């Protein structure tokens, strides 16, 4: 009920013997209370909507990416399951993710329409959009390589989300560098099992994670590090609409950034 504040305000004014002007004042104060309460309720409703859309769209687009290569294989499904494991998805949340993945695999999946809807709901929250794209890039690279069809789909996603080709290519380099810090891809062994593809991080990998060059000075590197840590702060992302189920991935990404920064400091000799 959006008028309890007014009722209480008027009742208090009458009990205190405030007369006509007391009632008017109580009504105005109650009205302000009702408006504030209404805005708060609307914020929570929008937050839930944003989180639900982020969750569903993430797995729908993941399914669409997988299908773009052709037939969805058992290995593809295994990779998607691994990602769900990383998010600690169980029970109803996991079932919802699996259903969304199947929706995305349909031949007539409206990718551009879905991305426009997603961008509209995440308007003004570039860090959310960035997190979404990073998850999709990670999923596309999960088998150790980027299929041309997957790249084409990712370009469409980036375009619809307002991300330039140059920004997208930088994201790719950052994700490739992050793979060496535990954020990564999978590769199939001779026995048919999947394992993380790691050769050990280099200075170049670390710089790619932060989006800087090995020749950049300490000030530039520190600025890039602080900006990325702020954009990937798990609590901030959840407050802006990241589903709580994906908070673990945000934490892992923040850890990659931290590890990359520590390696750069060690290699370049600054504090």
UniProtKB/Swiss-Prot annotation:
The protein's name in its UniProt record: Co-chaperone protein DjlA
Membrane topology label: Single-pass type III membrane protein
NCBIfam families xrefs: PRK09430.1 (NF006948)
Assembly with partners or alone: Homodimer.
Domain remark from Swiss-Prot or TrEMBL: The transmembrane domain is a dimerization domain.
Function summary: Regulatory DnaK co-chaperone. Direct interaction between DnaK and DjlA is needed for the induction of the wcaABCDE operon, involved in the synthesis of a colanic acid polysaccharide capsule, possibly through activation of the RcsB/RcsC phosphotransfer signaling pathway. The colanic acid capsule may help the bacterium survive conditions outside the host.
Pfam annotation, one family: DnaJ
GO molecular function, one term: protein-folding chaperone binding
Impact upon substituting residue 16 to R: Only partial activation of rcs
SMART domains on file: DnaJ
SUPFAM superfamilies, sorted: Chaperone J-domain
């Amino acid at each position: 009920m959006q008028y309890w504040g007014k009722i209480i305000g008027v009742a208090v004014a009458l009990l205190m013997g405030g007369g006509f002007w007391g009632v008017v004042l109580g009504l105005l104060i109650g009205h302000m209370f009702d408006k504030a309460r209404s805005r708060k309720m609307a914020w929570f409703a929008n937050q839930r909507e944003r989180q639900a859309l982020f969750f569903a769209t993430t797995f729908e687009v993941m399914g669409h990416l997988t299908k773009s290569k052709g037939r969805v294989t058992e290995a593809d499904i295994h990779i998607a399951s691994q990602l769900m494991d990383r998010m600690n998805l169980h029970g109803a949340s996991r079932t919802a993710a699996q259903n969304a993945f199947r929706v995305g695999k349909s031949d007539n999946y409206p990718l551009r329409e879905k991305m426009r809807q997603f961008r509209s709901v995440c308007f003004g929250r570039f860090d959310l959009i960035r997190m979404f794209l990073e998850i999709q890039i990670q999923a596309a690279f999960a088998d150790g390589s980027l299929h041309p069809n997957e790249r084409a789909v990712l370009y469409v996603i980036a375009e619809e989300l307002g991300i330039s080709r140059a920004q997208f290519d930088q994201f790719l380099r950052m994700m490739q560098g992050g793979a060496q810090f535990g954020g990564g891809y999978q590769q199939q062994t001779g026995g048919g099992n999947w394992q993380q593809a790691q050769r050990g991080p280099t200075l170049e990998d670390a710089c790619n994670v932060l989006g800087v060059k090995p020749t950049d000075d300490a000030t530039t590197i520190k600025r890039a590090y602080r900006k990325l840590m702020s954009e990937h702060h798990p609590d901030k992302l959840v407050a802006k609409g990241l589903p709580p189920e994906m908070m673990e991935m945000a934490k892992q990404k923040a850890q990659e950034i931290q590890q990359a920064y520590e390696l750069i400091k060690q290699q370049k000799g600054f504090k």
